């Protein structure tokens, strides 16, 4: 037998037992005539002692180096009271080694487990990086999450049904990864960006509660929290309303946090998209941050200051204020840095006002813009934002998008910089009632979620007549500023689906070519249905306390969508390309 126990599982209950351990040398120390090693496996570390009583094992131990793969047979003994290590789960015991076998030696490592390595090193030698206890713990947590999800779904009547990986390219927002067909020359499969259409077809097939933990693929520019291939917890239901779907999913996330962290998330507040953008400048607000945006354009229409009266009198303008409590200590240098920061989002400047003494009116404030404000306007402003002595006010004034984006980002930065964001808290919420459509960079209408989302209380005729007023029956779950899941009630009426396609500029011929199977299926008694998908990678990020999605994926890609370990992607064999009728044109 190669193993009877895991290293990290040993404790006082095992004292006196003979054990066989298999794992790696984490560290070695020579103390006089004794040799100690910390031995590691996926469950943790235990101290092993080599004593002259077992001379053969001691002699062999002298050749051990870090990351040798070994087997130990010995007895679990109690550590002396003065040697108990309270920082280790196994710190009350050690193993007295009676025999030692070396499975495999290890060359000097290209990584140093005791120092920070570059991300490039970590990804190139990922198999070594994953040996680090913190990485092993993250992947164990991920496994616990998927185990919990499967149990929860099974208990609530959901069926785990697989959907195809090789499918048809359909417009879902990002670029597809294409797979050429050898049999059907010149034709391509697409790897799915999500199982969206297949799970809707399953609802039409009568499987009223579906789920799947599934790989999805998007060929898009990457960020710290994005990967070209990612994992979704995908869910779809029939005959449930949006609030009922949210209730089930909220219950699942409650259980997940309770089982993983021992944390009670409490009742999730529900907030409309409009309120989230107005108060926080984001559709995924981090409610740990107490700062809010307050609209003041109506108070500044008559001021003789172009920066303010322009947006104040523009129907598409916005002036928003962030009040920072006790912020008068913020220096001019810091204000200049914040001004540069909002410039990233298109803002042309950042006005500010320090409140030194409310009772003194104009004499009690300090600001380059104070000279443009009357006593009445100043008083109304200070009352609107509920200013207190010692506060500083920051003003954003521009078109609606620039002001909202810039001040929303500034709110987050101020929260971090000034220690206002309560990092130890968990603040979940639902965001609902998104716009059905938004304008893309060319000014055309695009679906804010996807083209299969149902509008709220709109007929096809009303939607076609006034699409920009439509609200989507959609919902996102947000935790600490991260969108962890999103979903919607789906369109189940063929006329409504065709109307949405037309609004998006998809003509009838293109509808038949790309979505003919869906439009046909909608004609045969399609039930009302709704669903949601969680990002498993992002959930695991939150539950393990990392801010890099690559830390919770065993073999992730870089921000250039490359695998440094296997050197993927690589050039294909010319013969294989010939069989696929694919020609590679070299870029000049």
Curated annotation (Swiss-Prot):
Record has Chaperone as a keyword: no
Binding site for ATP: 218-220, 227, 483, 535-538
Principal localisation: cytoplasm
InterPro entries named in the record: Aa-tRNA-synt_II, aa-tRNA-synth_II, aa-tRNA-synth_II/BPL/LPL, Asp-tRNA-ligase_1, Asp-tRNA-ligase_1_N, Asp/Asn-tRNA-synth_IIb, AspRS_core, GAD-like_sf
Pfam families: GAD, tRNA-synt_2, tRNA_anti-codon
GO molecular function, one term: ATP binding
Listed GO biological process terms: aspartyl-tRNA aminoacylation
Record region (Aspartate): 196-199
GO cellular component term, pick one: cytoplasm
Subcellular location: Cytoplasm
Catalytic activity, as annotated: tRNA(Asp) + L-aspartate + ATP = L-aspartyl-tRNA(Asp) + AMP + diphosphate
EC number: 6.1.1.12
Binding site for L-aspartate: 172, 218, 449, 490
Record keywords, A-Z: Aminoacyl-tRNA synthetase, ATP-binding, Cytoplasm, Ligase, Nucleotide-binding, Protein biosynthesis
Similarity remark: Belongs to the class-II aminoacyl-tRNA synthetase family. Type 1 subfamily.
UniProt subunit comment: Homodimer.
Protein's job: Catalyzes the attachment of L-aspartate to tRNA(Asp) in a two-step reaction: L-aspartate is first activated by ATP to form Asp-AMP and then transferred to the acceptor end of tRNA(Asp).
Name under which the protein is recorded: Aspartate--tRNA ligase
Species name: Pasteurella multocida (strain Pm70)
Gene giving rise to this polypeptide: aspS
């Amino acid at each position: 037998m190669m193993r009877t126990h895991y290293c990290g599982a040993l404790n006082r209950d095992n004292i006196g037992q003979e054990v066989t351990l298999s794992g790696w040398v984490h560290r070695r120390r020579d103390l006089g005539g004794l040799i100690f090693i910390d031995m590691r496996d996926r469950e943790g570390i235990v101290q092993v002692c080599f004593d002259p009583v077992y001379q053969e094992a001691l002699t062999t131990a002298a050749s051990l180096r870090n990351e040798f793969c070994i087997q130990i047979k010995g007895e679990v003994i109690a550590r002396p009271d003065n040697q108990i290590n309270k920082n280790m789960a196994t710190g009350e015991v050690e193993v007295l080694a009676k025999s030692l076998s070396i499975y495999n030696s290890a060359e000097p490592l290209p990584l140093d487990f005791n120092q920070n390595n570059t991300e490039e090193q970590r990804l190139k030698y990922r198999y070594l990086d994953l040996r680090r206890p913190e990485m092993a713990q993250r992947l164990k947590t991920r496994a616990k999450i998927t185990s919990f999800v499967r149990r929860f779904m099974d208990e609530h009547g959901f069926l785990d049904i697989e959907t195809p990986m090789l499918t048809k390219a359909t417009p879902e927002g990002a670029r597809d990864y294409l797979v050429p067909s050898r049999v059907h020359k010149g034709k391509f499969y697409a790897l799915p960006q999500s199982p969206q259409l297949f799970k809707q077809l399953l609802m039409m097939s009568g499987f009223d509660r579906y789920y799947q933990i599934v790989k999805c693929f998007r060929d898009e520019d990457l960020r710290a929290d994005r990967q070209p291939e990612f994992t979704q917890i995908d869910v779809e239901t029939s005959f449930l309303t949006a609030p009922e779907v949210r209730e089930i999913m909220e219950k699942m996330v409650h259980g997940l946090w309770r089982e993983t962290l021992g944390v009670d998330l409490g009742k999730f507040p529900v907030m409309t998209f409009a309120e989230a953008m107005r108060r926080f400048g984001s559709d995924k607000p981090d409610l740990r941050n107490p700062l809010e945006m307050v609209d003041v354009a109506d108070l500044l229409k008559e001021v003789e200051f172009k920066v303010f009266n322009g947006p104040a009198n523009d129907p598409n303008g916005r002036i928003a204020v962030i009040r920072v409590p006790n912020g008068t200590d913020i220096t001019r240098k810091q204000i200049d840095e914040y001004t540069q920061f909002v410039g990233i989002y298109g803002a042309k400047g950042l006005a500010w006002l320090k409140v030194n003494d409310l009772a003194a009116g104009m004499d009690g404030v300090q600001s380059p813009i104070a000279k443009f404000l009357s006593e009445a306007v100043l008083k109304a402003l200070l009352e609107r934002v509920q200013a207190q002595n010692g506060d500083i006010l920051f003003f954003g004034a521009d078109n609606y998008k620039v002001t909202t984006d810039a001040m929303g980002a500034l709110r987050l930065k101020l929260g971090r910089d000034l220690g206002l964001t309560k990092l130890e808290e968990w603040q979940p919420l639902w965001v609902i009632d998104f716009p059905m459509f938004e304008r893309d960079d060319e000014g055309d209408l695009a679906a804010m979620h996807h083209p299969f989302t149902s509008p709220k209380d709109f007929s096809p005729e009303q939607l076609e007549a006034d699409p920009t007023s439509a609200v989507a029956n959609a919902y996102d779950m947000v935790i600490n500023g991260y969108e962890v899941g999103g979903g919607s009630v789906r369109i189940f009426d063929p006329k409504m689906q065709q109307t949405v396609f037309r609004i998006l500029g998809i003509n009838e011929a293109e509808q038949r070519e790309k979505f003919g199977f869906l439009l046909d299926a909608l004609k045969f008694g399609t039930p009302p249905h709704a669903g949601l998908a969680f990002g498993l990678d992002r959930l695991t990020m939150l539950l393990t306390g990392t801010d890099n999605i690559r830390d919770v994926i065993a073999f992730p890609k870089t921000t250039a969508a490359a695998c440094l370990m296997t050197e993927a992607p690589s050039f294909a064999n010319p013969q294989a390309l010939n069989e696929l009728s694919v020609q590679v044109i070299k870029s000049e």
